[in-house]
Regions:
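A Rossmann-like FAD-binding core segment of flavoenzymes
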Residues: 2-11, 92-118, 123-126, 187-283, ...
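Beta1-alpha1 glycine-rich phosphate/pyrophosphate-binding loop at the start
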Residues: 20, 26-95, 167, 179-205, ...
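Residue-level detector of alpha-helix initiation sites
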Residues: 34-35, 58, 135-137, 176-177, ...
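Glycine/small-residue-rich loop that forms an oxyanion/phosphate-binding "nest" at active or ligand-binding sites
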Residues: 99-163
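An active-site-proximal "capping" alpha-helix that borders the catalytic cofactor pocket
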Residues: 309-325
């Protein structure tokens, strides 16, 4: 008699055997798209590394949820985020990158070639791996928040603050990131409401002092965001104060600054990360603690998080990968 557990174990073994038999060997594998992944692909392809790129769950990354991008060189009239990522993708493919839709579900970086499982069914064996999986902004989870993403709701003041020049905006969050966003917006916008759920700021004392010393920032302690309102764009926000009273603030932009989650979970058994999950790279490079595995873009950058810096680190990762492969006689 065969028990279910034994049957399941045998099925798993058979599946693993089937996967292993179909392993595809590649020189350079890029995990993730967006500015970092596509730029890495452009440089890797031009270096004749025959890169294979898996786009992941959100092809094009965070920029595909952005309407207008006006701060990336080469687009003097601005460009829609999705169109910009399509341009990056076409350029990567033009030089020979094999761009594929698929999600990397597990990895084994214990030895080279590195084993990467895609969609729980296909194995890639790669001599070099570039991780460009990005980070996901944390949101409040309101329906109205989803409704206005790209139409007044943003998770990046540096990216979108300019659209609200001379207008009133709100920033939600009480840490250093929220303070930095509020201070940045204070130099562009007429008024900045800082919505803080607790009755105190979690930011450093120095950052708090800068916020409280800025005349056009109003800190609303003990306020919870209940709803973002407007017709086609954001027009206001409904807050609940510590007394349970509902208060409306008229705003044009709503900036969420409660943190990001780096998409690094599947790499943690092998790759060193900080306490927040950002991949740690060696200073001045994209090298991780595993030789032959490189990281670029927002998965390793918690300071800048810009398309241009992500693209730059993607270039670095491809150059680092090419040099690594050359040193090992594999380029």
């Amino acid at each position: 008699m065969i028990t279910f557990g034994k049957l399941e174990t045998q099925a798993g073994a058979d599946k693993q055997k089937e996967i292993s038999a179909e392993a595809e060997k590649v020189k350079c594998l890029i995990i993730g798209s967006g500015p970092a992944g596509y730029t890495a692909a452009i440089y890797a392809a031009r270096a004749n590394l025959s890169p294979v790129l898996y786009e992941g769950i959100q092809p094009g990354g965070q920029l595909t949820t952005t309407t207008e991008v006006e701060n990336f060189p080469g687009y003097p009239d601005g460009v829609q985020g999705p169109q910009m990522m399509e341009d990056f993708k076409k350029q990567a493919m033009r030089f020979g990158t094999d761009v594929r839709f698929g999600i990397v579900t597990s990895v084994d970086f214990s030895k080279r070639p590195f084993k990467v499982i895609v969609d729980d069914e296909k194995t890639i064996e790669a001599q070099a791996v570039i991780i460009a999986t990005g980070a996901t902004a944390k949101y409040l989870g309101l329906e109205s928040e989803d409704k206005f993403k790209g139409s007044g709701v943003s998770a990046c003041a540096t990216c979108d603050g300019f659209f609200y020049k001379g207008q009133d905006v709100a920033v939600v969050g009480g840490g250093d990131t929220a303070c930095e966003e509020a201070l940045y917006l204070s130099g562009i916008c007429r008024k900045v409401y800082m919505i803080v759920r607790k009755d105190y700021l979690r930011a450093s004392k120095a950052m708090q002092q800068r916020v409280f010393n800025t005349s056009n920032i109003e800190v609303l302690l003990g306020h919870v965001t209940k709803e973002i309102v407007g017709s086609n764009v954001v027009e206001g926000v409904i807050l609940e104060n510590s007394k349970g009273e509902l208060v409306r603030k008229d705003i044009a932009g709503f900036f969420v600054a409660i943190g990001h989650t780096p998409n690094s979970e599947i790499f943690k058994p092998w790759i060193e990360t900080d306490e927040q999950g950002y991949i740690i790279t060696k200073p001045g490079s994209t090298h991780t603690n595993v030789p032959g595995v490189f990281a670029c873009g927002d998965v390793q950058d918690k300071h800048y998080r810009q398309a241009i810096t992500a693209a730059g680190s993607g270039c670095m990762a491809a150059i680092d990968a090419e040099r690594f492969l050359s040193e090992h006689g594999l380029a």
